[in-house]
Amino acid sequence: MSDESILVRLQAEMVRCMKEKDAETLSTVRMLKTALMAAKTAKPKDSTLGGDEEIEVLQRYVKNRREAIEMNVKVGRAELNAAEEREIAVTQRFLPAPVSEDELAAIVKAAVVSTGAAGPKEMGKVIGVVMAQVKGRAEGSAVSRLVKQALGI
């Protein structure tokens, strides 16, 4: 991922989509930009979104799209999922590369050792250490699942 902000990259992608007449991607990019701008205006005046905050906004967007997919399946409208999947794919281009399952398992094992966690009561401590290390590159559900495995829960 480059050093420039996600907002700048989204703006460049909007220009590219307009030139290439890519309406589907343009629609998603506009929604992402709107979500970032809304998060920025929710902050105090003269403050900006940091890189981590931008990533959180996009991750929240992906999470919402995944929830929409689940709801579509529950109500029998699975045909709507193609658009949701496209939006997820576009959004993920602006997020940091996810950590692999093997890397995540190694990070979890190291966190269990470093915290000295032995049971379910210390699960939160381990998850906190792991989430701080992976910062937006792994989903909380995957971290939780691997921590439970490592602690034998």
Question: Which residue stretches match the model-derived regions?
Answer:
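Charged, compositionally biased, marginally structured helical/coil segments
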Residues: 1-153
